[in-house]
Regions:
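Intrinsically disordered, charged low-complexity linkers and terminal tails
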Residues: 1-190
């Protein structure tokens, strides 16, 4: 994950092979393939490759940590609206999020933690989009499981993963998401 690498660089745990300044405060860091393997080995990381990407995606879903309910809601939105290439229009995902959380509130249930825009209310579609892209989507994007095309406002399941997943895999993903949401909301009630 990019945040972890940035933190390791800042803490002096990892040294890039090349760093190029970008603007006043940012740097692009580059690593040789051998360096990446060594860093992963040193810190117990496991590289995501085209060969293991679909398996890593499924494992990530099975074991996903949840500070908020956003990851499973995003996956369910993707399943609901994706086309035959694994693409979904971002406005459809925004609609799904709004419908999901507003439906919970309409049925007298907690939408989310009190700090969440969905619990507070008064949010705009732009607020929801920003929330989706900064919270659940970014984590999937950092691992290269999902991609975003800004020009046409779509989110796409990485084609390497999408080609390997069957309908049964997607039904399993939705089932895992439903169970994760159920556990999350039980925990939130306490």
């Amino acid at each position: 994950q990019s945040e972890t690498v940035e933190r390791y660089i800042k803490d002096g745990k990892v040294k890039p092979d090349l760093s190029i300044p970008f603007g006043d405060k940012r740097m692009f860091h580059y690593f040789r393939e051998e360096s990446i393997r060594n860093i992963a080995k040193q810190y117990g990381g496991d590289l995501i490759t085209p060969q293991n990407m679909a398996d890593k995606f499924m494992k990530f879903i099975e074991t996903m940590d949840m500070s908020y309910s956003y990851k499973p809601v995003l996956l369910k939105a993707i399943y609901e609206y994706m086309d035959s290439s694994g693409r979904v229009a971002l406005p459809d995902v925004v609609d799904y999020f709004i419908d999901f959380y507003e439906d919970r509130k309409a049925h007298g249930m907690i939408a989310e933690k009190s700090t969440s825009i969905y619990q507070k209310g008064g949010y705009t579609r732009k607020d929801v989009e920003k929330n989706i892209l900064s919270n659940p989507f970014k984590r999937f994007e950092d691992m290269r499981f999902l991609m975003r095309c800004k020009d046409v406002e779509t989110i796409e399941v990485n084609p390497i993963i999408f080609r390997k997943l069957t309908r049964e895999d997607w039904l399993h993903i939705v089932d895992v998401c439903d169970k994760s949401l159920e556990k999350y909301y039980l925990r939130l009630k306490k």
